[in-house]
Amino acid sequence: MQIDERDNVLQRVRLFARSVTLGFVTSVSVVCAQAQTTPEPTLKIGVIGPFTGPSADFGVPMLNGIQQAADEINAFGGYLGRKIVLVKKDDQANPDVGLKLSQELVAEKVLATIGFCNTGVGLKSLDTFQTNKIPLIIPCATGSPLTAKYPAIESYIFRTSARDVIQAPFVVNDIVKRGWDKVAIFADSTGYGEAGLKDVETALTAQKLKPVYVARFKLGVTDLSEELKAAREAGANVVFSYTVGPENAVIARGRQALGWKVPQVGGWPLSFPSFVEGGKDAADGALMAQTFIAEPSNERRASFLTSYARKFNVKKIPVPMAAAQGYDAMYILVYALLGIRDNNLAGPAIKAALESKNKTYYGVVATYEQPFTREDKDAITANMLVMGVVKNGAVSFAYPEDAKRNLFVQRKQ
């Protein structure tokens, strides 16, 4: 395709997109498919995450969101007439399995990969993508080290989820305003818990506070009553938990069993079914950082939620953030590919395209004018966060003003 023809396509698409709720990149696929009718090989995109096992409650929604976006793009002719094929790998939330499967994705010559829900799993596999110059977009895992391991300018690691280094201070600032200044931190021993603990401690230090108690525990623990008693004796008036599994519910039920009526707060895992359903009424009132709450607050989000429910035959998404962030990641990737003028789909060219300022993508989580740059590989900024609260077995907005603000999709700051 000649440059002037591609520019003409983009201009037509931009005008068309204004009338299409589904989003900008879907319309890109419509017109680009018209511009190239000769059949081409497929585009292989890797998808890796925990699709079975205890982390599947957020791994499967991530996969579904990515699949939903890919299917929408393919329905309109794919990328320049080339169908997108997802090469799916189930890492089972196991770092060793994740590394092996990441190496398989490289061997299968995927153009890029979207995935990872567990920080520890992702950390063990980063070198595989970085060394082979294959862009990796992380739409789920939030551990701060994931996008900090390599110098930003050199890094092939991108992310569309909210890293914990912005989630932790967001929550800490809120609890301090509420007068909850004696914080007990409960963090698991995974890479996620380790990084999260440091982020919370840093956020507390910024408020001139220190945790009154810190508990560490392994995944799979079923009783934390002794640690909760120690936290109570230390004078804690809030529990900040950092774990991704049912251990959050263990903490909630433990507090309830002790009759210890202090709030539980944390990052986005407090919106997971393992906590909301596992903790039952003990989970009510818990506060957590969110980028996306499954309420049809505007036309874009309503369309996404309706399409997801119809496609996957569900009444509600188990972890809406994972689905929405995966969905946006797929579109951001395809949009970046469209920005490559010479059809060079080698890793360095895709990396450069992701870092470039392209036309605005109107996503579900955010409006992405330029999600990434050479110096910044995280698409989500603190202004996009809202506070969620568990209420009657569901997650909703903790503050009416957040619900009103959510009517307008945020942009990166």
Predicted regions and their residues:
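N-terminal twin-arginine translocation
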Residues: 12-13, 30-34
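Bacterial N-terminal signal peptides
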Residues: 18-30
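Hydrophobic alpha-helical segments, especially transmembrane helices
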Residues: 13-15, 19, 160, 309
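Extracytosolic ligand-binding ectodomains
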Residues: 2-5, 33-413
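N-terminal secretory signal peptides that target proteins for export/translocation
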Residues: 1-15
